[in-house]
A protein has these predicted regions:
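Ser/Thr-rich, low-complexity intrinsically disordered terminal regions
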Residues: 4-7, 15-147
Length: 147
């Protein structure tokens, strides 16, 4: 019995370590959010149009907003590239969610496309939608106060 408990504890600890150190593949996670599926279980896709002609500047705003979000960091890309992928981890287990944002300038506006999805599990219980919605709300607030 004691041996079984130790094996179970070891497996739980190993899984906890794995979700924190497992590498991310650039080709899998830093994909174009415009081409991402509209519906994916545990995923969320949304767009925001800003009055700006500078895609890089718009993505710099996104990076600034994401930097304020707990346990979030840039995973791949940069505003200069036109696409940035962020990883946000859950508080206790450190499960990663990836949010990729692209910016496309068209005339005097920039369309930001957000695509958030979890790496492990089947359902994120609306966490990705909540995060993207909060980022969009903050960007809209910044946009309206800068006018």
């Amino acid at each position: 019995m004691k041996k079984t408990v130790l094996v179970i504890v070891a497996l739980v600890v190993a899984f906890g370590i794995y979700v924190r150190v497992a590498p991310f593949d650039l080709a899998t996670w830093h994909t174009d959010p415009i081409e991402a599926p509209e519906k994916r279980k545990g995923g969320y896709k949304s767009t925001l149009v800003l009055e700006s002609s500078n895609a890089q500047s718009a993505l710099e705003q996104v990076v600034s907003v994401a930097a304020e979000w707990p346990r979030t960091r840039v995973l791949f890309g940069s505003p200069a590239e036109g696409r940035v992928s962020f990883v946000t981890r859950t508080r206790i287990w450190g499960f990663p969610d990836v949010t990729t944002v692209s910016a496309v300038a068209e005339g005097q506006s920039v369309t930001l496309t957000f695509y958030a999805r979890q790496r492990f599990g089947g359902d994120d219980h609306g966490v990705n939608r909540g995060r993207v919605s909060a980022w969009i709300a903050q960007l809209q607030d910044q946009s309206s106060t800068s006018k």
